[in-house]
Amino acid sequence: MTDMKEVDARGLSCPEPLMLTAEALKNEKGPVRVLVTEPHQRMNVEKLAKDRGRKATSTETEDGFAVVIE
């Protein structure tokens, strides 16, 4: 089983979640799990993943969204 890097960006204002995600994708070749609060942040993280040639899968959580980038 592969350890998954987690970026907890809940409660942060844009563009912080995107910047933290970009940094994690730059440093991690494996999967990255990003936690965000707002729907537009989820969409931005998914778009960033797609732009980097990675696949993103989102699920709604109690306090926002979890986006797993592979």
State each model region's role.
Residues 1-28:
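An N-terminal amphipathic alpha-helical segment
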Residues 1-2, 36, 41:
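Short, structured interface segments that constitute the first stable element of a domain
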Residues 4-6, 31-33, 64:
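Intrinsic-disorder/low-complexity, polar/charged segments enriched in Ser/Thr/Lys/Arg/Asp/Glu/Gln
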Residues 16-23, 39-52:
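Amphipathic alpha-helical interaction surfaces in cytosolic regulatory modules
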Residues 25-37:
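Short glycine-rich, basic-tinged beta-strand/loop micro-motifs
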Residues 56-70:
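C-terminal edge-of-domain segments
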